[in-house]
């Protein structure tokens, strides 16, 4: 499933990998007075005077001596500090686990399991819901697994492609996977992580509105114009930008110039949805510019070169943010444009 989403990990470790650190950690917490027994369970008090709500102790061992999630998560922190000495450890889980991580982080700090300058952060995720507002399920009412979700999205895109007869049957499945990937990843990332959202397959696979396929279509449009220009024997000149001639061109340039700042801000706030909001804005600015501007039929060669350089820059930014793996041969991807009714490419 991760492979289908083109998601890869440098390291894959489970709770069992930290088990060996638990015995020494328990002894350390007891010997240094951080942990004490309360009704038979070994706990560490983590409440603070400034708390506005009750924060229960962090439970290290149950009364029967069994370890808990707190135990393994703390042992994992010790393992990571010993092996990697990270500047920051960031946990991604259901937002309903927030209290658990507050307890773990406070315990780790109190017991000096991490350095003072090591950041511990938690990103809580909301739930992906169906149109009824309840957690997304299969048609049969079971839990929707990622593999099945990917399959349903790909099938939806395949049907749209077949119905429009826009791609050769031999290419239809591959094209459906490309567009389906953009729909899933963009659809999820465009929502603020902590908020619940409705995953509407029909809306997310649409080529209209704030969707991955719409961004992909915009990339297709830029590639088509650039491809047409090169087919005529011309060579694209990088960095040939002139001062903007129209309001739409100026707006597009300003939007492109915000790229670095948006990415930096999204990184600092751990908010990828801000990048999605930006590329949607950029795609809209480009399409506005495109509809107002005769690009390839521009008689002033310097001005035309400027248009094309700007267009290429927009393409690179959109492609980088949507996903580099979506860079496909132009003659194949251009067929996607036909999936949008009334949207035949106007290359002049």
Task: Pin down the residues of each PLM region.
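Non-catalytic interaction-recognition regions
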Residues: 1-331, 348
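Cationic, low-complexity basic patches in intrinsically disordered or flexible, solvent-exposed regions
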Residues: 336, 347
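Short, low-complexity intrinsically disordered segments enriched in A/P/G/S/L with frequent Arg
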Residues: 340-343
């Amino acid at each position: 499933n991760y492979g289908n989403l083109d998601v890869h990990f440098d390291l894959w470790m489970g709770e069992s990998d930290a088990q060996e650190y638990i015995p020494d950690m328990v002894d350390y917490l007891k010997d240094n007075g951080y942990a004490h027994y309360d009704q038979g369970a070994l706990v560490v008090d983590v409440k603070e005077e400034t708390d506005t709500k009750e924060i229960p102790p962090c439970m290290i061992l149950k009364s029967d001596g069994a370890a808990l999630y707190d135990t393994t998560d703390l042992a994992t922190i010790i393992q990571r500090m010993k092996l990697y000495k990270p500047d920051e450890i960031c946990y991604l889980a259901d937002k309903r686990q927030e209290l658990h991580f507050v307890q773990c982080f406070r315990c780790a700090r109190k017991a000096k399991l991490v350095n003072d300058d090591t950041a511990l952060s938690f990103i809580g995720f909301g739930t992906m819901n169906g149109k009824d507002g309840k957690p997304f399920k299969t048609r049969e009412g079971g839990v929707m697994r990622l593999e099945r979700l990917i399959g349903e999205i790909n099938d939806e895109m395949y049907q749209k492609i077949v119905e429009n007869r826009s791609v050769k049957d031999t290419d239809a499945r591959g094209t459906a996977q490309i567009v389906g990937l953009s729909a899933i990843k963009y659809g999820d990332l465009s929502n603020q992580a902590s908020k619940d959202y409705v995953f509407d397959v029909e809306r997310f696979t649409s080529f209209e509105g704030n969707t991955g396929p719409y961004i992909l279509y915009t990339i297709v449009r830029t590639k088509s114009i650039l491809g047409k220009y090169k087919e005529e024997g011309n060579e694209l000149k990088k960095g040939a930008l002139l001062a903007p001639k129209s309001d739409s061109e100026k707006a597009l340039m300003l939007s492109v110039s915000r790229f670095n700042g948006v990415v930096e801000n999204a990184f600092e706030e751990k908010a990828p949805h801000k990048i999605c909001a930006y590329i949607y804005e950029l795609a809209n600015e480009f399409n506005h510019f495109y509809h107002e501007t005769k690009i390839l039929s521009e008689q002033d060669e310097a001005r035309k070169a400027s248009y094309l350089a700007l267009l290429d820059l927009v393409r690179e930014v959109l492609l980088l943010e949507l996903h580099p793996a979506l860079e496909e041969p132009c003659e194949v991807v251009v067929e996607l444009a036909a999936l949008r009714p009334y949207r035949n490419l106007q290359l002049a």
